[in-house]
């Protein structure tokens, strides 16, 4: 993971799917989760890694720390006061460190699935830029990602009213289609996507 230094913190680790991929790349990694039940599962899953700290954290928080960076995938859309949450992330990171975010894109794609999973919003680049700027962060990268994923998600959840589940088709998409999409989007940034990707620098 670029941008994050050697001692990052993940906000909203859930069951640790991303953390398991990232841990080998850092000398130290802190995984956090707000939900007590998921925190127990997270500790069971990551507890065997000596380089990992696992702790409960709910944003916004007044905690101040000096992590080398912060990463949060598909969490900010659950938080009502997302600007205060971003300010909290900034206080956890030392000056000059980066915050890496992925959030779901486009309000028109808000579906019963989003609502059922606790989403209070979906983002555009404009709304993400506004939130990051209001939080006092300097934007370094901001773009849409996974254009094909948005089309598939919208058709599945809003047109056909399906509930996406882990299964053979999802795994096949992740294994075969997603890598090709990522490679293509490195060359040409799409004007839309399933997610907004952002990298922002903490002042100082």
Can you say where each PLM-predicted feature lies in the sequence?
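Residues that recognize and position ribonucleotide moieties
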Residues: 52, 121, 190
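A C-terminal cap/extension of S-adenosyl-L-methionine-dependent methyltransferases
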Residues: 64, 149-204
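Conserved S-adenosyl-L-methionine
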Residues: 137-148
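Conserved SAM-binding loop
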Residues: 1-111, 129, 198-201
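Short, hinge-like loop/turn segments at secondary-structure boundaries
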Residues: 47-50, 117-120, 157-161
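A structural motif corresponding to the C-terminal end of an alpha-helix
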Residues: 134-137, 202
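Acceptor-substrate binding/catalytic loop of class I
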Residues: 112-131, 144-145
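Short glycine/proline- and charge-enriched loop/turn segments
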Residues: 107-114, 159-164
């Amino acid at each position: 993971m670029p941008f994050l230094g050697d001692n990052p913190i993940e906000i909203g680790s859930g069951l640790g799917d991303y953390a398991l991929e990232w841990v080998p790349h850092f000398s130290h990694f802190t995984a956090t989760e707000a939900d007590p039940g998921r925190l127990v599962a997270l500790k069971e899953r990551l507890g065997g890694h000596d380089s990992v700290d696992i702790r409960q954290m709910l944003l916004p928080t007044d905690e101040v720390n000096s992590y080398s960076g912060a990463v949060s995938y598909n969490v900010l859309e659950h938080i009502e006061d997302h600007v205060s949450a971003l300010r909290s992330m900034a206080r956890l990171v030392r000056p000059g460190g980066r915050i890496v975010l992925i959030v779901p894109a486009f309000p028109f794609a808000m579906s019963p699935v989003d609502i059922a999973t606790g989403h209070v919003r979906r983002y555009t680049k404009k709304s993400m830029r506004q939130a990051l700027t209001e939080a006092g962060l300097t934007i370094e990268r901001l773009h849409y990602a996974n254009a094909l994923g948005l089309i598939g998600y919208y058709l599945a959840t809003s047109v056909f009213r399906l509930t996406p589940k882990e299964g053979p088709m999802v795994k096949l998409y992740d294994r075969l289609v997603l890598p090709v999409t990522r490679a293509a989007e490195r060359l040409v940034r799409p004007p839309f996507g399933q997610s907004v990707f952002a990298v922002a620098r903490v002042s100082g």
